[in-house]
A protein has these predicted regions:
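Generic hydrophobic/aromatic pocket-lining and core-packing "Φ" positions
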Residues: 11, 31, 65, 89-90, ...
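CE4/NodB-like, metal-dependent polysaccharide N-deacetylase domain
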Residues: 13-21, 67-72, 125-126
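Glycine-rich phosphate-binding active-site loops on the catalytic face of alpha/beta enzymes
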Residues: 1-5, 41-54, 95-116
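Glycine/Thr-rich beta-alpha phosphate-binding loop at enzyme active sites
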Residues: 39-66, 70, 75-78, 84, ...
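Hydrophobic, well-structured mid-protein blocks that either form specific transmembrane helices
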Residues: 1-34
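C-terminal helical cap(s) of enzyme catalytic domains, especially alpha/beta-barrels
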Residues: 7-16, 56-59, 104-135
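Catalytic cores of alpha/beta
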Residues: 23-38, 77, 82-100
Length: 135
């Protein structure tokens, strides 16, 4: 873990070097604070749900999206934790994210290839239904 001061220095240094900056947050409060650093992407996932197969609630998704947009519309929002299929990806985008994280949902699956294809299908359906995700 980093202190806030260390995190700020690391973000500024990464930007100086031309690196993309992705930060993770647990709550809407953290999302809002981290959004002030203007990362390229904020990966939002309740820590308690990581690896559980349980997805974040629609309320959580909407709260983090609104918190980030209150600071900047230029930050890519990724909703993670519990994403295991195309419907989970669809719901993340429906609730304002541009993408969804699903590492344990893929790696723990019996057929990871099929899960990836299902997630891509959910993404395609979501961008057809919610074209506003493209900023």
């Amino acid at each position: 873990p980093m202190t806030v001061g260390q995190l700020v220095k690391a973000v500024y240094r990464a930007k100086e070097l031309g690196l993309l900056v992705d930060l993770c947050c647990d709550s809407a409060e953290e999302a809002k604070m981290l959004a002030t650093l203007k990362p390229n992407c904020l990966i939002c996932e309740p820590t308690s749900l990581i690896g559980t197969g349980k997805t974040a609630s629609e309320t959580y998704m909407q709260e983090v999206v609104n918190a980030i947009h209150a600071i900047s519309d230029d930050i890519i929002i990724c909703i993670g934790a519990g994403t295991k299929n195309g419907n989970d990806v669809y719901n993340a985008i429906k609730n304002g994210a541009q993408c969804a994280g699903g590492s344990s949902g893929i790696f723990a699956a019996e057929n990871p290839h099929a899960v990836i294809l299902d997630m891509l299908d959910g993404f395609k359906r979501a961008i057809a239904d919610f074209p506003r995700w493209q900023r």
